Amino acid sequence: KRNPLFLLKSFEWRSLHSTQIPYYIIPQIYFGYSYSPDRFSYGSLVNQWAKYSGKTALYVGLGAYKIGAGAECEKADWESGRLLEKQIKDLRSLKYDGFVVFSYSSLFSNDPLNTSEREKISQLIGAE
């Protein structure tokens, strides 16, 4: 019996993309800019995904649940109170179609870092 995670990891979305057109693709990029190894850092992954263009909308899943609790190598990113704001600005400059936040409820914690991130995102969205 195959592990469903293996099947998910081995899914080749580009073959689907060439035969059927999905409405959107949402890579879950839940890493900070200083994540190590660098090939999995936020900046590296969004630049890689930005190369895939076509008729399919491209959004990015952002890991709000990691606010204040990222991996040791990226801890400063997740404790800045501005990481999601920076990530969203970068997505806009790369012409992504949007973003999705997981878990949205994480933004509404009473923790000062979560509050800061929520306020920064609200300002960005309000500036559109």
What residue spans do the PLM features occupy?
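Beta-propeller domains
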Residues: 1-3
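Mature, folded catalytic cores of secreted/periplasmic enzymes
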Residues: 5-8, 15-16
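Charged helix-capping and loop-helix junction motifs
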Residues: 7-10, 40-46, 82-84
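Substrate-binding cleft of secreted/luminal carbohydrate-active enzymes
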Residues: 13-38, 54-128
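Surface-exposed amphipathic alpha-helices with a cationic face
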Residues: 46-54
